Amino acid sequence: MSQPITRENFDEWMIPVYAPAPFIPVRGEGSRLWDQQGKEYIDFAGGIAVNALGHAHPELREALNEQASKFWHTGNGYTNEPVLRLAKKLIDATFADRVFFCNSGAEANEAALKLARKFAHDRYGSHKSGIVAFKNAFHGRTLFTVSAGGQPAYSQDFAPLPPDIHHAAYNDINSASALIDDATCAVIVEPIQGEGGVVPASNAFLQGLRELCDRHNALLIFDEVQTGVGRTGELYAYMHYGVTPDLLTTAKALGGGFPVGALLATEECASVMTVGTHGTTYGGNPLASAVAGKVLDLINTPEMLNGVKQRHDWFVERLNSINHHYGLFSEVRGLGLLIGCVLNADYAGQAKQISQEAAKAGVMVLIAGGNVVRFAPALNVSEEEVTTGLDRFAAACEHFVSRGSS
């Protein structure tokens, strides 16, 4: 008989780069999870915007099981039918002409930044290497992507960092304009800063970046790892803004819980990449591709995308009502089902404590820094699940406020 697994085993066996919750989920269905003790949770965290169709979706299970019964992996010396079907679906649904598949958002962003450097080197010369990114951004945990993310807390322990990366203020086109010039090879930006506090870009800001990139022959990269695959009520957030990038990165919800990432590119951009310039062993494997193909089939429909916008209204209306009663938040912001509740000055820095109270009440939420409680639920979360989950969140807020005043 195997040894029982407990939360304490994490602290004993794992490299301590995470501080997970005190409970261990063991089973999920839809937007509900159950832990080892059988306690039920409504999941508004969605695996950090990953579980776009909830837990154990029957059609995703079927797609995975069907491919698992055939073959799992061959490596990049061979292609496979599921990955080619997935590539065609992404190309047909977006601006892209070409796709590179990998395993995560960080890998997709790494590929985008490498492509941008190579594009500039081949077309204009090695002097054109500057990358402009934004303060409080998050693009992944590789050395290149953590350097592009404008959060020193994630990068300062790993110096020396890759050079020629510059950070402007987000949503400030004048700040960006001061850094973008003819030596800039690329600008990388999140249409909504997720980890940075659920901060949507303005239309004018993204349009201004597009114009600056065109003027200086720089590539515009949209990091849609968190905003992509229906999260904002459009398949990709660039469609909401009406600003088309040269490169787009996607992951998280693309696999619905199965690890997969992709870089989408125009033909012109992709043309500089040749055999051997980049690669990955697992990227585009048939298991991930089969699941992701089914995810796109289910999400890229008018009914699903319009439903995201409807669910946004359910959340925002109720969160504003909760705030009316307890006075925790200065703002409820976001697009679609990426929503942030910004704590007011009286409760600054206490988002983690609120998320912990929420878990005790039976609802899972995220944070985005110390001042923002973040919601990234399944796109198909039911009205009953929204009501029940927000009832529990309201109870958590009541307990948090009463505890603080006692």
Swiss-Prot record:
Domain of life: Bacteria
EC id: 2.6.1.81
Residues with the N6-(pyridoxal phosphate)lysine modification: K252
Gene Ontology MF annotations: identical protein binding; pyridoxal phosphate binding; succinylornithine transaminase activity
InterPro entries: Ac/SucOrn_transaminase_bac, AcOrn/SuccOrn_fam, Aminotrans_3, Aminotrans_3_PPA_site, Class-III_PLP-dep_AT, PyrdxlP-dep_Trfase, PyrdxlP-dep_Trfase_major, PyrdxlP-dep_Trfase_small
Pathway field: Amino-acid degradation; L-arginine degradation via AST pathway; L-glutamate and succinate from L-arginine: step 3/5
Gene3D superfamilies the UniProt entry points to: Aspartate Aminotransferase, domain 1 (3.90.1150.10), Type I PLP-dependent aspartate aminotransferase-like (Major domain) (3.40.640.10)
Known catalytic reactions: N(2)-succinyl-L-ornithine + 2-oxoglutarate = N-succinyl-L-glutamate 5-semialdehyde + L-glutamate
Cofactor requirement: pyridoxal 5'-phosphate
EC category: transferase
Gene Ontology BP terms: alpha-amino acid biosynthetic process; arginine catabolic process to glutamate; arginine catabolic process to succinate; ornithine catabolic process
PROSITE patterns assigned to the protein according to its UniProt record, in alphabetical order: AA_TRANSFER_CLASS_3 (PS00600)
Family according to the record: Belongs to the class-III pyridoxal-phosphate-dependent aminotransferase family. AstC subfamily.
Protein's job: Catalyzes the transamination of N(2)-succinylornithine and alpha-ketoglutarate into N(2)-succinylglutamate semialdehyde and glutamate. Can also act as an acetylornithine aminotransferase.
Protein name: Succinylornithine transaminase
Organism field: Escherichia coli (strain SMS-3-5 / SECEC)
